[in-house]
Amino acid sequence: MKVIISGGGTAGHINPGLAIAKYIKKREPDTEILFIGTERGLEARLVPRENFEIKMIKVRGFKRKLSMDTLVAVKELFQGLAEARKIIKDYKPDLVIGTGGYVCGPVLFNASRMKIPTLVHEQNAFPGVTNKILSKFVDRVAISFKEAEKYFKDKSKVVFTGNPIRSEMLEVSRETARKKLGIPKDMPLVVIFGGSRGAENINSTVAELIKRHKSDLGFYLIYATGEAQYDGIMKKIGEVKSPNINILPYIFDMANAMAAADLVVCRAGAITVSELTALGVPSILIPSPYVTANHQEHNARALERQGASVVILEKNLRPDILYEEITTLLKDRNKLSQMAKNAKSIGITNATERIYEIIKDIMKNKAAG
């Protein structure tokens, strides 16, 4: 079997694709898989790291306001459609999967027009524009939140699967992870990140928190700034001599970081929330207020209602508030343990298996009809 997977821009679109790819290879080792992405997206680095082939097309997202960028986006859309069609024609896939982001638009549209079996996966409770458009053309739409179904007109195509979790996220033990990361035996680990591109308000808050508590932090900290903001944040924080503070541009080994963590502080993107619950990790969630339909707060509140997370809205975020929330939770081991159990109880760990079964069903139906 030959499969094309397209999705990108942010890790939230790329990691589900990688999880699906690995599961397909596990079930059918002879499968050939090709990713299609853009040079600008994070997929240009993440996909090769996982030893999958990737080809690039030229396409970019549309801005809401009419400008020169809009004209460039239109030009690149037509270019991307042509490039995607050529790649598909040359590769001759048996199946094409989209995991969101503007790059999968030209790919899935072309595949559907070429009568190749197609599937899109939507990670969020409020579907993205690209997936809503593609839903009219593809064979199946896999959703991660049941609330998302109402946004798709043809309900017969929609199947609830949950979000794919990378297999390595489920295979690492806490003890092994802490040893690999060099976390002192009796020291709690807090992992903080704001997404693959970073988050300015979270970064400014955490930078100030570190400046104030360089010598008396009280826990081991792994903190990812996002690559674009790393240099500026390091300049703001100044010299950090503590061996218990590890500041990185990006956490490539998220499996070990999450498995080792006592507490995670992060945004409430769909994939992150799914990984937290699958692993049973307590969290402080700071939903992004800049996303469509405020879907991150909906994700965060769902965990809060289950007693798996504490939610701090960005408008209320300050260094003293965040530090107090972190230290209060770390001191109350019983509460932290209960939060972990609550998170685990709502996690879905077999989404990739569900998606694989849908894939087989699509291909069976295409072959029959």
From Swiss-Prot:
Catalysed reaction equations from the record: di-trans,octa-cis-undecaprenyl diphospho-N-acetyl-alpha-D-muramoyl-L-alanyl-D-glutamyl-meso-2,6-diaminopimeloyl-D-alanyl-D-alanine + UDP-N-acetyl-alpha-D-glucosamine = di-trans,octa-cis-undecaprenyl diphospho-[N-acetyl-alpha-D-glucosaminyl-(1->4)]-N-acetyl-alpha-D-muramoyl-L-alanyl-D-glutamyl-meso-2,6-diaminopimeloyl-D-alanyl-D-alanine + UDP + H(+)
EC supergroup of this enzyme: transferase
Family: Belongs to the glycosyltransferase 28 family. MurG subfamily.
Cited SUPFAM superfamilies: UDP-Glycosyltransferase/glycogen phosphorylase
Lineage: Bacteria, Bacillati, Bacillota, Clostridia, Eubacteriales
GO MF assignments: UDP-N-acetyl-D-glucosamine:N-acetylmuramoyl-L-alanyl-D-glutamyl-meso-2,6-diaminopimelyl-D-alanyl-D-alanine-diphosphoundecaprenol 4-beta-N-acetylglucosaminlytransferase activity; undecaprenyldiphospho-muramoylpentapeptide beta-N-acetylglucosaminyltransferase activity
UniProt name for this protein: UDP-N-acetylglucosamine--N-acetylmuramyl-(pentapeptide) pyrophosphoryl-undecaprenol N-acetylglucosamine transferase
Membrane topology reported for the UniProt record: Peripheral membrane protein
Source species: Acetivibrio thermocellus (strain ATCC 27405 / DSM 1237 / JCM 9322 / NBRC 103400 / NCIMB 10682 / NRRL B-4536 / VPI 7372)
InterPro entries: GlcNAc_MurG (IPR006009), Glyco_trans_28_C (IPR007235), GlycoTrans_28_N (IPR004276)
A UniProt-annotated Pfam family: Glyco_transf_28
Gene Ontology terms: cellular component: plasma membrane
Its job: Cell wall formation. Catalyzes the transfer of a GlcNAc subunit on undecaprenyl-pyrophosphoryl-MurNAc-pentapeptide (lipid intermediate I) to form undecaprenyl-pyrophosphoryl-MurNAc-(pentapeptide)GlcNAc (lipid intermediate II).
Pathway(s) served: Cell wall biogenesis; peptidoglycan biosynthesis
EC code(s) of this entry: 2.4.1.227
Gene assigned in the entry: murG
Annotated compartments: Cell membrane
GO biological process: carbohydrate metabolic process; cell division; cell wall organization; lipid glycosylation; peptidoglycan biosynthetic process; regulation of cell shape
Alphabetical UniProt keywords: Cell cycle, Cell division, Cell membrane, Cell shape, Cell wall biogenesis/degradation, Glycosyltransferase, Membrane, Peptidoglycan synthesis, Transferase
Main localisation: membrane
Residues that, per the record, bind UDP-N-acetyl-alpha-D-glucosamine: 10-12, 124, 166, 196, 251, 296
